[in-house]
């Protein structure tokens, strides 16, 4: 049985459809990331799951029980769902301990014991318990918000872009710590984000949302390497898209012959490669004949660790852009050999 099931969820505001027949299953103890651009409907979907809003159609099932099905509506505070908002939303007039313990029942001793357990769980120094929210760092504030959400022993944790306000280094470390914590506690979770890297690294199930629909749902590696369509491919990362003629397990394209992930397709198709699949080797003139594909570097856009190279394929004159790790031996006018690792992905007809 799934922890959460969404069946044909629909939602409109006046004449604007925000969610269009959303179906999603969240397995027990799993981490799901819903990723999409601003305005795609992901936050509205999260609010419907939490019980802050009701859908116009569909069913929300939590651990086999209907939270909403058109006749049944269970309010947010009775769903057993934890919620961590984007800014943490800590109570400024409560200490760290007061925030974590908000809503806990029992004796003062029991509350203190539970607060200490939760602080240990989210790796917060107990000495912070008497401090006010403004006296601790952004990363610590997010851990307090998570501890407060965990205090009620939720069956599902919802995370609404909780790392977006943190700096890059802190965002990555906090994200990893939260993912490990939720896994250890065996709590299913849903992260909403517009950051593709965050979604791919946090989740074991990624759902790409576009214009109120889930375009593709599956494991992160599947979505990255075998996306359902070109918009999903480009949204999840840098790509090289090429038109090719297919036959006998190979694509004949501007880069020469490339292995493909569907050897049975024939005819013309669009194929995709990720930048890390393409290896560039600077060549001397006497090495040209041994290269499977020759290209000339006609422009370099340096951006620190990564550079964008504009290459002109010598055999066809076609130009392509690829991103690669910046190297001192690459310069405009250089002739390079291109080699492809792995298979190109063929998009469905």
Curated annotation (Swiss-Prot):
Root EC class: translocase
Subcellular location, record wording: Cell inner membrane
EC assignment: 7.2.2.7
GO biological process, one term: transmembrane transport
Binding-site positions, ATP: 36-43
Protein family: Belongs to the ABC transporter superfamily. Fe(3+) ion importer (TC 3.A.1.10) family.
Record-given protein name: Fe(3+) ions import ATP-binding protein FbpC
Organism name: Yersinia pestis
Gene name of the record: fbpC
């Amino acid at each position: 049985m799934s922890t959460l099931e969404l069946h044909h969820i629909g939602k409109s505001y006046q004449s604007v459809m925000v969610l269009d027949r959303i179906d999603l299953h969240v397995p027990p103890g799993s981490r799901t990331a819903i990723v999409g651009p601003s305005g795609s409907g992901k936050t509205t979907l999260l609010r419907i799951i939490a019980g802050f809003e009701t859908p116009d159609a569909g069913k929300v099932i939590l651990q086999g029980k209907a939270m909403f099905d058109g006749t049944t509506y269970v309010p947010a505070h009775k769903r057993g769902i934890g919620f961590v908002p984007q800014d943490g939303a800590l109570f400024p007039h409560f200490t760290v301990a007061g925030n974590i313990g908000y809503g806990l029942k029992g004796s003062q001793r029991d509350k203190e014991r539970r607060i200490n357990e939760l602080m240990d769980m989210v790796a917060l120094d107990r000495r912070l318990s008497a401090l006010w929210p403004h006296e601790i760092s952004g990363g610590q504030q997010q851990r307090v918000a998570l501890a407060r959400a965990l205090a009620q022993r939720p069956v599902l944790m919802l995370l609404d872009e909780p790392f977006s306000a943190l700096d890059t280094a802190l965002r990555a470390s906090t994200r990893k710590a939260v993912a490990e914590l939720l896994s250890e506690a065996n709590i299913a979770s849903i992260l909403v984000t517009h950051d593709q890297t965050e979604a791919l690294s946090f989740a074991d199930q990624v759902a790409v949302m576009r214009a109120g629909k889930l375009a593709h749902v599956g494991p992160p590696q599947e979505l990255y390497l075998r996306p359902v369509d070109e918009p999903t491919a480009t949204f999840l990362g840098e790509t090289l898209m090429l038109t090719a003629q297919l036959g006998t397990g190979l694509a004949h394209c501007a880069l020469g012959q490339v292995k493909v992930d569907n050897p049975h397709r024939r005819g013309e198709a669009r194929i995709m490669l990720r930048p890390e699949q393409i290896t560039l080797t600077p060549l001397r003139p006497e090495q040209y004949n041994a290269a499977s594909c020759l290209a000339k570097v006609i422009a370099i856009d340096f951006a620190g660790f990564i550079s964008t190279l504009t290459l002109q394929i010598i055999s066809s004159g076609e130009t392509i852009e690829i991103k690669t790790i910046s190297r001192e031996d690459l310069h405009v006018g250089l002739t390079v050999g291109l080699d492809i690792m792995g298979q190109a992905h063929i998009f469905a007809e």
